[in-house]
Amino acid sequence: MAKKLEITLTRSLIGRPQDQRVTVNTLGLRKMHQTVVQEDNAAIRGMVNKVSHLVTVKEIEA
């Protein structure tokens, strides 16, 4: 089965640079404590690494 990532926005975007805000929005996160499920690939991993201080990530089997 393909692995997926469960990504939750845990820190606020207030006062964050524009590139971090865009990255979080590109991941599909709009509000605090919102969770999205994304495919586990290099592009998503790169975005998560860029904003790792703002999100929590869990690997799930889907």
From Swiss-Prot:
UniProt xrefs under PROSITE patterns: RIBOSOMAL_L30
UniProt KW Protein transport keyword: no
GO annotation, biological process: translation
Xref: Pfam families: Ribosomal_L30
SUPFAM superfamilies membership: Ribosomal protein L30p/L7e
Database matches in InterPro entries: Ribo_uL30_ferredoxin-like_sf, Ribosomal_uL30_bac-type, Ribosomal_uL30_CS, Ribosomal_uL30_ferredoxin-like
Keyword Ribonucleoprotein: yes
Keyword entries, A-Z: Ribonucleoprotein, Ribosomal protein
GO MF annotations, alphabetized: structural constituent of ribosome
GO CC terms of this entry: cytosolic large ribosomal subunit
Family of the protein in this entry: Belongs to the universal ribosomal protein uL30 family.
Subunit architecture: Part of the 50S ribosomal subunit.
Official protein name in the record: Large ribosomal subunit protein uL30
Organism field: Halalkalibacterium halodurans (strain ATCC BAA-125 / DSM 18197 / FERM 7344 / JCM 9153 / C-125) (Bacillus halodurans)
